[in-house]
């Protein structure tokens, strides 16, 4: 079934080519009768001839049609136009239509000796339109070979004395038939399928040798027949399916024989009969052109059957075919009549209307071919999977070539303090934030805000690693100076780590890349475990060497000649020696206080602490264990943890910086502050007389009503009192006066006295965990502390 876009309207494109004058025309002093004004306008028989000045003009005969006639065409080529220029503006433009399923035809029309055969065939030095068109067609087919499969069939025939002959396989005259589906068909015509443009051009050259030519007085190489070279292009999508679209287009390149006058050519006998048949077929072609161009005429009959030539070109002129007519004319006044007639019919052909439609056929496959189609699809899928697998293997092998080229021994010496993975870098960031958590809680409940830091400024993690790397300044330079290869290894590994961090930050990591980086990490850790530890020339035991390294002063470290240090490094080293020990001791003290008050923690605080412990890094845990083992040691020993990045190696981790800002509103729950003393005393005052169990009532507790008012006051900041905590309770949980017994009052008084003994622990616990709780100013916990629980009946919890 024919499918495709709606028909497109158009007209026949007409171009005119003026050939250069021949030597005989120059010697005869014949003035030109054509003047090319520009690329579209041509003047016939101008008033001022373009001949040499002073040349005698031949007298005008009585048959001269007019003077100074102007013709407008789609393109006008002067005497100096080349074959390539004519091709660019004629058949090159219609090749796109052929590849899109449109029929196209290009034919040269004109008198004998006007240059039709030269324009279509050319010579070896200057090939014509047929040669250039075939070369360009195969070039475009090769460009779209991956998308569509193309098949090219060619045929070459001639019409000689109203008989059709095969030029590629010469044989007798062939009959012409009309098929309702295929159109005009020449019975017995051979079709050939060239594999390349060179093979096709060879076929074209052999066909021209079989073409009938004979010299006449008008033309030494006069063609005595009409040659028709047809190219069939069949295209199909490479994707196999149950229904496929098939595009079939036909392109006809026609070299017509020239009309001739018997009085001019002086032909007799066989040549005279040939000329008569040529003129008869051209007359039939002119009638067809007139009928197609006369749109106002009521005649619907087109005289295609008047000649074998017109029957053969029935589907190549007008209708569903993009047609280009090349009118070849002579500028000499000797061919005045022939030039005028050619221009007149060429101007007439411009009025032929076209209705272009793409020849797309939808082929539905029979059910018997479904199995074959499925096999083809499976084969195509297997081929694509094999190509994809080969591509992935090549990419994986290329990634493995980098560690394979590096020498495996002494891997840990090349990167003694580099992070084994980006997770270690992030864990060091968590340790740095946890060490400063105790100091942050004392700044008035400031809020921590994390935002990205530009790569140019160093992050706190980088500064910490830089200070830790300066503890052993004489280790890395000595090892890197041993071999240039080890330095190259360290550089490559740092670049790989940087690439991993950047890709992960941009969310561009693929599973293959992650596996490659993990293999590289495992290789580094494996080599670090296998490689022997470097020997120390001092001869001291390891503990003593560690003690000496910790007790060394910055001046002692900078005095060693083998360590290249800078002023910034010395300043950071001084900061390290001044600030590293207090942070660790404060952390140990804080953790010991938290362990003492573990019995007073609520379930919510236990969950918060469990989450905080899970966030802590292995490095910090290792440091705490070492500190607990040797609490009286003046300097902490080096923890057995993965090595950190040295100061000379670029550290690539998620760059974040911690900024602080004051909260929008201060509250007692956030700042661990208490209301005034009088409110607190009244709130928790209990009856002194044990013998009066019924004296407890709601009006005896004015602090419950004044607490919200005290929290809303903004005249002055709340003064933290470390001696008395604040406890509040929901109204629904207040026991009724009748439900309180004498024993419950005594137990409550004992619980309050026990709670007052551990107020210091509670206050320290509240201070350390206030920054991590998001409690509202008026929120009341559902579960009271275990030291102040109400016994007896209470409201719903």
Swiss-Prot record:
MF terms from GO for this chain are: ATP binding; ATP hydrolysis activity; microtubule binding; plus-end-directed microtubule motor activity
Give me the stretches of Polar residues compositional bias.
594-608
Q: Give one Pfam family.
A: Kinesin
Q: Which residues form a coiled coil?
A: 367-402
Show the ranges annotated as biased composition (Low complexity): 731-744
Function in brief: May play an important role in microtubule plus-end depolymerizing activity in mitotic cells.
Where the record annotates domain Kinesin motor, the positions are: 11-352
Cross-referenced SUPFAM superfamilies, in alphabetical order?
Answer: P-loop containing nucleoside triphosphate hydrolases
Q: What is this protein called?
A: Kinesin-like protein KIF18B
